[in-house]
From Swiss-Prot:
<keyword id="KW-0732">Signal</keyword>
<dbReference type="InterPro" id="IPR007195">
    <property type="entry name" value="TolB_N"/>
</dbReference>
<dbReference type="InterPro" id="IPR011659">
    <property type="entry name" value="PD40"/>
</dbReference>
<feature type="signal peptide">
    <location>
        <begin position="1"/>
        <end position="24"/>
    </location>
</feature>
<protein>
    <recommendedName>
        <fullName>Tol-Pal system protein TolB</fullName>
    </recommendedName>
</protein>
<keyword id="KW-0574">Periplasm</keyword>
<dbReference type="Pfam" id="PF07676">
    <property type="entry name" value="PD40"/>
</dbReference>
<feature type="compositionally biased region" description="Low complexity">
    <location>
        <begin position="323"/>
        <end position="332"/>
    </location>
</feature>
<dbReference type="GO" id="GO:0042597">
    <property type="term" value="C:periplasmic space"/>
</dbReference>
<dbReference type="InterPro" id="IPR014167">
    <property type="entry name" value="Tol-Pal_TolB"/>
</dbReference>
<dbReference type="GO" id="GO:0051301">
    <property type="term" value="P:cell division"/>
</dbReference>
<comment type="subunit">
    <text>The Tol-Pal system is composed of five core proteins: the inner membrane proteins TolA, TolQ and TolR, the periplasmic protein TolB and the outer membrane protein Pal. They form a network linking the inner and outer membranes and the peptidoglycan layer.</text>
</comment>
<dbReference type="InterPro" id="IPR011042">
    <property type="entry name" value="6-blade_b-propeller_TolB-like"/>
</dbReference>
<dbReference type="GO" id="GO:0017038">
    <property type="term" value="P:protein import"/>
</dbReference>
<keyword id="KW-0131">Cell cycle</keyword>
<comment type="function">
    <text>Part of the Tol-Pal system, which plays a role in outer membrane invagination during cell division and is important for maintaining outer membrane integrity.</text>
</comment>
<keyword id="KW-0132">Cell division</keyword>
Length: 431
């Protein structure tokens, strides 16, 4: 595990910090709008520290578990004790509060970083005797990776208790339109919770619709540099940018195929706005849609066999589904911006009231997850547990986070401009 984590941190350093781009001054941070009272109670006890630590590990893990909507961490003030290891836990004291699992741990300063050790403890004996250790691990990270270390704990605890892979070591890309300046448009990347934000590219002209490659190493986006819409693919490690589509008219809404070899996009290069597919590095595109109406916002199925897209061919915008090689399309519902979960079971999209909804692929049953004003661009976490989207608040755009079960809702407001077009990264830890 330690060798693996060291390799991953080295890869992250190359991928995200060797871009030679500016660190953003103002980060988006989660502001809770609605809690998770109906979720499973859990306790994350403050970690015992040895020396000064640049971040509160327990606080980060608590926030991660809460943000998933699956857990309702109890506040420190309600904890009957604050053990640092499993041997110090009094199971009955926690079971009396309805808490069947707790996280305890220690953080120790080392010569070149911090060692984070945790134990997940069963307080009711569901997996054996009360007080049994369900999971434990320790990781050593440098100071700037302290939050990554905490998210590692969150991922492991989450997966142990839910059998779903955690996605707290992922990132989000988004566009910020700043208030003034010669280059007010920026693409930024941050941890999923808004921390460790940095600028990928800035421009005097609009930037739109960032999309991640499946390996997390590239972003495709729309740039209006040179006074025309172009599709750009940028390597996040080197910062190298390549214009892959600059056809006459509009070129927009890029989406990488699941294997990363192709890009689907929308273009009106032949007059009508249609869906096209081409190689991820550019090349001659293949037109997939035709007929009346405008077609845009392509999104691939997890296996790459089909594409969801938005079309007004029926008179008003609606989501359709077709083969990734083109052909007949069937209506799905909603109004647009559809994305399918990685297991292929759930669709997330915008409905006619501009709310974020999820829809069961098999039954067609749907549920409204957000009622915020003018919801746009929903993007699923790679495990399908959380959704980030943009909405209008006052005169500007902010990012919103909602758990896929609708229990937890929060905002990630920007402090230096409008924030829009969020895109959740794939898994970046590769475990």
């Amino acid at each position: 595990m330690m060798k693996f984590l060291t390799r991953m941190l080295s890869a992250f350093a190359v991928l995200f910090f060797a871009i030679s781009t500016a660190q953003a001054d103002d980060e988006v941070r989660i502001v809770i709008d609605e809690g998770v009272d109906g979720a499973r109670p859990i306790a994350v006890v403050p970690f015992k520290t040895n020396g000064s630590v640049p971040a509160d590990i327990a606080e980060i893990v608590t926030a991660d578990l809460r943000n998933s909507g699956k857990f309702n961490p109890i506040p420190v003030s309600q904890m009957p004790q604050q053990p640092a290891s499993a041997s110090e836990v009094t199971p009955d004291a926690w079971a009396a509060l309805g808490v069947d699992a707790i996280v305890v741990g220690q953080v120790t300063a080392t010569g070149n970083g911090y060692n984070i050790a945790y134990q997940l403890v069963d307080t009711v004996g569901a997996s054996g005797g009360a007080g049994a250790v369900l999971a434990q691990n320790s990781v050593t990270v440098g100071a700037k990776w302290i939050r990554y270390g905490a998210h590692t704990v969150s991922d492991e605890v989450f997966e142990k208790l839910t059998a779903i892979k955690g996605a707290f070591r992922t990132r989000i890309a988004y566009v910020v339109q700043k208030n003034g300046g010669s280059k007010p448009y920026e693409i930024r990347v941050a941890d999923y919770d808004g921390f460790n934000q940095f600028i990928v590219n800035r421009s005097s002209q609009p930037i739109m619709s960032p999309a991640w490659s499946p390996d997390g190493k590239r972003l495709a986006y729309v740039s209006f540099e040179n006074r025309k819409s172009q599709l750009v693919v940028q390597d996040l490690g080197s910062g190298a940018r390549k214009v892959v589509a600059s056809f006459q008219g509009h070129n927009g809404a890029p989406a990488f195929s699941p294997d990363g070899s192709r890009l689907a996009f929308a273009s009106n290069k032949e007059g009508q706005l249609n869906i096209y597919v081409m190689g991820a590095n550019g090349g001659q595109p293949t037109q997939l849609t035709s007929g009346s109406g405008n077609n845009t916002e392509p999104s691939w199925s997890p296996d790459g066999s089909s594409i969801l897209f938005t079309s007004d061919r029926g008179g008003s915008p609606q989501v359709y589904r077709m083969s990734s090689s083109g052909g007949a399309a069937s209506p799905v519902g909603g109004r647009g911006s559809a994305q399918i979960s990685s297991d292929g079971k759930t669709l997330v999209m915008i409905n006619g009231n501009n709310n974020v909804v999820k829809q069961d692929v098999t039954s067609g049953a749907s549920e409204v997850l957000s009622t915020s004003f003018l919801g746009e661009s929903p993007s699923l976490s790679p495990n399908g547990i959380m959704i980030i989207y943009s909405s209008t608040q006052g005169l500007g755009k902010v990012l919103q986070l909602v758990s896929a079960d609708g229990r937890f809702k929060a905002r990630l407001p920007g402090t230096d401009g409008q924030v829009k077009f969020p895109a959740w990264s794939p898994y970046l830890d590769k475990n």
